[in-house]
């Protein structure tokens, strides 16, 4: 008989941490005790059955034992086969479940476009929509021989991007991202293959794009016709406005026609009177000049007659034009006379704009400004001519006497040693008085193909009143250089031509003669 074992396994022992609240519950403790008792009874029954089975096996005969062993082996084999089949079925079910899960995941990952692509092998593509994606940003044409910028992945034609990089633009033309050199460019044959598949003939496609279609031609004709109609309407409206403006101007000017005709008649009468008086003065002057040698008394009579006529004219003009009385006092100063006349005539006719630069008709038909000087006083042509001559003389005197006027100096350049240095093809020059000798030396050096430091400019040394022709001087050689120093004077760089003209040119000479030679080393 086996000893009854009342021990418990670790799984059967209740954990105090799992049941903290049942420790102080009496009902929970009773339940545990009942469970333990039932377990002990079951274990005891099993042990009893086991002991009985062992006793039966000992009593059974050997033959029976062998038969029982064969039956047990067959049963075990059948059980093993059933278990193997069940395992295989379970594995197959697991594999099927895994495949279904994978298919579900693949279906989730797939997009609608891929599903449609699986359904149909080919897609319809509109080339107009893809045109922008295959366009070169530089030439705006379809990309040929694609090159991709590695920094930004923008694509260009090979010729376009190479030309841009040669010009020194080390940046992407599309996004202005810096590119170090052409090494950052890569060919893209796959993109070229895609373009070749989409556009079989790129040149013909671009020609079709550039060509005008019939609809566009009709639309352009309509636009041109509408523009022509609008321009015609505008021109007609402008013509109408001009005609209306002219009619209004004629209506406004009609009251002034009578006054204008009177002024014209008065002006004509005054011009005729002035011309006749001037003619009489000229005749009297000629007669007086002819008889001056014969009789001195005729001069006195002529002067008296002229004075009387001038007094008559001045009195008549003062009565007709009181504003011009002050202007007759001085015929030489035309600007003062003009200003005085305009100041006086402002009160007479305030409707006119009295600007000395604007020609206007004054009272009695006389002009406020004439072509040559002031003629408002009706002076003779001889007095006007004398005033003009006086003005010209004064201007010439001021220009000659003034220090600001500088005349050009005529210079002649001559070579002292014609064997070494030839004469210039154009030796005569016209220079400014402020020109320096240094600048002239640079010019000579440039003409004879020498350095500026190797050229020396000389001028004849002479006393006042003496003239020396430098053209007649003998050729200077290194042996005679010391002797020529006494006759010639070397010029400094800071000297001006005006100073040389005063010191080295005589009154009857027309040119300042300057010689040049190669500077001699001592």
From Swiss-Prot:
Q: Under which pathway is this protein filed?
A: Protein modification; protein ubiquitination
Q: Quote the biased-composition stretches of kind Acidic residues, using this chain's numbering.
A: 65-106
Quick check: keyword Membrane in the entry? no
Please indicate which superkingdom the organism of origin belongs to: Eukaryota
- Comp. bias (Basic and acidic residues): 32-64, 287-306
Q: Which SUPFAM superfamilies match?
A: RING/U-box
Q: What happens when the gene is disrupted?
A: Normal phenotype. Drastic growth defects like ectopic meristem formation and sterility when associated with the disruption of RING1B.
Q: Which GO terms describe its cellular component?
A: nucleus; PRC1 complex
One GO biological process this protein is involved in is:
cell fate determination
Write the Enzyme Commission number(s) for this entry: 2.3.2.27
Q: Which Pfam families match?
A: zf-C3HC4_2 (PF13923)
What quaternary arrangement does the UniProt entry report?
Homodimer or heterodimer with RING1B. Interacts with CLF. Component of the PRC1-like complex, at least composed of RING1A, RING1B and LHP1.
Protein's name in the database: Putative E3 ubiquitin-protein ligase RING1a
The species is Arabidopsis thaliana (Mouse-ear cress)
